[in-house]
Amino acid sequence: LRDKILGTNSHVVVTNVTQTGMVDYETIMEKVVKVEGVKAAAPFILNQVMLAYGDNAVGVVVRGVDADREAGVSDLEKNLVQGSLKMLERPDKSSGKPRRDGIILGKELARRLGVQLEDAVSMVAPASRMTPMGLIPKIKLFLVVGFFESGMFEYDSNLAFISIHSAQKFFAMKGVVSGIEIRVEDI
C-alpha cells in the first residue's frame, strides 16, 4: 500500500502559502535539487475539472505535468498500461485525426467515461468566462493518449494527466505552477 501511494505521488510537495501559484518555480527547483538527499524535482499544476464523453460526465482532478521531469518524482511512467508521457506533448498524428493536446486517464476513469485510446474527451473548467452571451464555461477537447493503473482505486477512477503547458494555457496560468513535486533518496 505504501509503495502504491508513494509511487503515484511524490515524497514532498512545495506550494505557495497563498495558493496563488508559484511564479519563479524554475529558480526554486534549481535550489531544491541542490539540497542533499533530494533526487529530483518537477513542477505541476493541479485543478478540478469535469471530463465528458458522449452522455458520460465525471468530476476529476487533473494534473499538469512536465513529461521530461515527472519520471524523476513519481512512478507514473511505470504505471502506464498504454501510451507514454511524451504523448501528452506530441500525440501521434498517424491516425489522421486533428492534432489535439493529449490526456492520460486512470483505467477506471476511462471505463466510467466509456473511452478508448484516441477518443476525444471534453474538459470543462470550473471557472467560466464572460462573453456577450453571458457566462460560458471553458471547454477544450483532449485526445486520449494513454491509461495508467496505480492499483489504488481512488487514483485510477478520479485522476487524469495533461502536459504542464496544456494546463497553463487551459487554466490561464502562463508562467505559473501550483507547486513543485520532490522525490528524496530516503523516506
Each language-model region and where it sits:
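A short beta-strand structural signal in non-transmembrane regions
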Residues: 12-16, 109-110, 176-187
